[in-house]
A protein has these predicted regions:
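Positively charged n-region of N-terminal signal peptides that target proteins for export
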Residues: 1-4
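Bacterial N-terminal signal peptides
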Residues: 6-17
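Boundary at the C-terminal end of the N-terminal hydrophobic targeting segment
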Residues: 18-24
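Primary mode marks residue(s) on the alpha4-beta5-alpha5 output face of response regulator receiver
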Residues: 24-230
Length: 230
């Protein structure tokens, strides 16, 4: 297990900057990011355990952004993030994932995160679909947060990313199921400095900012698979 994780970490460090940097710097046609409706609903439902997804709202990506395909009743929202929705803006080596239409990152925001965090990801998507560059998206998000048009983050909230079918980027693939803790202003030193890609909790996104994300890997046996026939 340790050897496998070490190999994965080496791949993340060695492959990701080159592979991501090699991505084109213009957006492919939006149709390359879109999925068939039923396939996207099924994939979104693999983001979390059925106890969450069976009662969650499901959103799908369309040419006009994310729209509700199924209205739930537990406050959670599940969807499939794309390259222009999912990547962090620090470390900067991942910014060009916005141009990669192969990224599929199923996620289920729990009710508090759906209220406070989801609008941030939807804004990033909107800005990308308007043709904004990664730097322009980052600036737009920061401006919206400063202006109060994005919800202020006062506490920690959570999302599931348990899909066995996620593709998080070149050299990363499905990695392993994990939860995302949206923890404003955390940095990795506060968690013990655990290395990127390790099985320990780590701050992977936007450390020291209101948008900081802690990734907590979970048992790979918990990965949620598509039902037969999909």
């Amino acid at each position: 297990m340790i050897a496998r994780l070490t190999t994965l970490l080496a791949a993340l460090i060695a492959v990701s900057p080159a592979a991501v940097g090699a991505q084109q710097s213009t957006y492919p046609p939006i149709d390359r990011y879109l999925m068939p409706r039923d396939a996207e609903i099924a994939l979104a439902r693999t983001a979390a355990p059925p106890s969450i997804t069976e009662h969650a709202t499901i959103k799908l990506l369309t040419r006009s952004g994310y729209v509700v395909a199924h209205q739930g009743d537990n406050g959670s929202v599940c969807m499939v993030m794309r390259g222009f929705t999912a990547p962090t803006y620090t470390p900067a080596m991942f910014r060009d994932l916005v141009y990669d239409p192969t990224v599929h990152a199923p996620i289920c925001f729990t009710a508090p995160a759906a209220k406070v965090v989801l609008p941030y990801y939807e804004l990033r998507t909107t800005l990308a679909m308007e043709g904004k560059s990664p730097d322009q998206i980052a600036a737009g998000v920061q401006a919206a947060y400063a202006a109060g048009t994005l919800p202020h983050r006062d506490g920690v909230s959570m999302a599931y990313m348990w899909s066995a079918h996620q593709h998080l980027g070149p050299g990363i693939g499905a990695w392993r199921p994990h939860v995302m803790l949206f923890a404003p202003n955390y940095d990795n030193a506060m968690l013990g400095g655990n290395p990127f890609g390790s099985p320990m909790p780590q701050v992977t996104d936007d450390a020291g900012t209101p948008f900081a994300v802690i990734v907590v890997p979970v048992d790979p046996a918990l990965a949620v698979h598509l039902p037969a026939g999909h």
